[in-house]
Amino acid sequence: MDALALLRPMMLIRAFEEALMRRPDHGFQLLSSGEEAIAVGICAALGPDDALLSSGRSIGPALARGVEPAAVMAELLGRTTGPCGGKGGRGHLAQPAVGFFGAHAVVGGNLTIAAGVALAMTIEQRPGIVACVFGDGACGAGALHEAMNVAALWKLPLVFVCDNNGWSVSTPRAAALAPARLSDLAAPFRMPAATVD
């Protein structure tokens, strides 16, 4: 994939979020500022049969996966023309038709859902994989370890992607998590892991 094909969606995410925050009715949002490449890189590796689930920081992943900007804006502003009829907002934005199986506002709430989607794909013998993006704050949640255990045990087509921005809401990572490298959390489950910067 050429660099411009990756740069364009990153610029779209940045411009979209900046335009959103200029609106007086933008509400509470979690932005992707400086992290646009994470969503774009993940989505560049996904195929049409693959599913993406994100944390509550959903705008970048939704746009990168192909949800139309006008539809995302409508959802964020509570309009009925949004993919969830304006009821999901940022924290529960979804559009499965384009492979964006949704966001979850609860820290780590998307992890077990992703395992369920991967299990359904396996049972139904559907092609594709599930990519689940979560923040480093979810690394201390039991749901991560439960989802990783099930994924490893049942050999589910599930890729865990930790977007480590160093903060769990307002707690610095070093005060909340013991591992120096969060990718080491995969070791007990004998899952391949890598730290990418």
Locations of regions flagged by a protein language model:
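A short, conserved beta-to-alpha structural element at the edge of catalytic cores
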Residues: 154-174
